[in-house]
Amino acid sequence: MPKPRKKENKGLPARWQIDHGAYYYHVPPGLEAAWDGKKKFKLGKNLPEAYRVWSDRISATEAASTVAQLLDRYALEVIPTKKPTTRAGNVLALKKLRSVFGALPLSAITPRHVYMFVDQRRKKKTDETGKVTGGLTVAHREVEVLSHAYTKAVEWGYINNHPFKNEVRLEGEKARTRYVEDWEIIECLALESKHKKGSVHAIHAYVRLKLMTGMARSDLLRLTVANLKDDGIHIQRHKTAGSTGKRTIYEWTPELNAAVEAAKQARPVLSPFLFCNRKGEGYIDEETGNCHGWDSMWGRFMDRVLKETEVKERFTEHDLRAKCASDAETLEHARALLSHADARTTEAIYRRKPERVKPLK
């Protein structure tokens, strides 16, 4: 949970702070280029001056003529509105986009430039530290950011038309096909716990809930007792809360009720969260969107599964969500379970069983 703001900072814009009588702005990581390379930018000694400097800093981007200037404004005004994990990925994308396209005039970008960029970025490379960079998925994400920045450029009046929207056809990413078999689930659930609570017990309950509901990890790990109503589990998908606002009620069954009770019993301490750490806190850091504690626990669980059971191929939590969709009798049921607004997403990504057809007589 983020720390509460100090009394003297309440009422100020986000990331503003009073320090030794002056007003400062804490620059989001990765956006330092738009603030003279500083992490903590001094706005002024009094509030009117601070707002004037802030206004000048924002308006300085209004005459953007290069890609770098466009990306600077995008970093200041658009990226901060996104979810933490998306924001972090966008910041990394901007760094690469600036280095490649930054000096170009806004009107100079053509579809050919985008294709050349993707062709170079799709090749994974290892730097001197051993870190792997690039790849097709990374290239696509970076182009998505550049494309959205140009969409904003049209909105802001910098240009009249998007230079490559509907003109670039990128090669699709290979869909994941891993289907977790029933016997593999049985093997995982048979894994014995070394502790009375938490750890394996929690993951067993998590797996059962995931397979019955198909909930995304971000929703499942945010479940609290407040979501448990008389008629079922009520959720609003975290991912689409600000867009479609999709709400779902998973109606109670004896099996679902048993899985929820198992999750409660597995908690190391009493907590509002259905899944919590030893401090009773939820696993998701709302400020960053990360859940490193849960990731570590899941990783250790899968290591034991591969070592102590007959399962030979690792699977992810996302694969369990796909299994739920694949095992549903109809596409519509799968779509409803996964809280998708469009069944095409469910069909293309999550329905992984081969289609059975009868031959003609």
Task: Please annotate each region the language model reported.
Residues 226-232, 330-349:
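Short, polar N-cap/turn motifs at the start of nucleic acid-interacting alpha helices
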Residues 15-116:
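N-terminal DNA-binding module of tyrosine recombinases/phage integrases
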Residues 42, 76-151, 155-158, 174-177, ...:
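N-terminal core-binding DNA-recognition domain of tyrosine site-specific recombinases/integrases
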Residues 155, 208, 212, 218-219, ...:
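C-terminal catalytic core of tyrosine-transesterase DNA break-rejoin enzymes
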Residues 253-311:
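Active-site/catalytic core of tyrosine-dependent DNA strand-transfer enzymes
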Residues 109, 201-203, 310-329:
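Short basic/aromatic active-site micro-motif
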